[in-house]
């Protein structure tokens, strides 16, 4: 965020490359374990989506190329679970924050517009075991009195919210966050 440029990074890089073997992840379905991906990116960097685009399905043939690294991580910290002010400060002053969510509900999978509200969970910021998907909070706002996070999502744009998706602010959805610093290469 320091450069004012939003660089789209390669999801496929993390799906294909040894992040799962090296950092104890068995499949892509464990995507909510963001710290494993952070450790991999700290050690290797991550390619841009332009140089290593997403391919539907599991390829597992690593095509990582250190010459096309779009970002590295110098470190990351955990934000107190459920602390919405701490998360707002992190997004505003440091940069993107990753968030684990349950993306298995029909409401999320078929979301089209407006502020999405998870009606399945009543966690109110508490940890629960149904985190299946990682998204990145890049901003926040208010619409019709409802506070929300603006998220970057790796799902495709067909049938759901695609890359940018507003979700209700700690109403029921967000339970685990990490903030990290990117070094953006130009």
Regions found by a protein language model. Give the residues of each.
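Catalytic-core signature of thiol
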Residues: 1-186
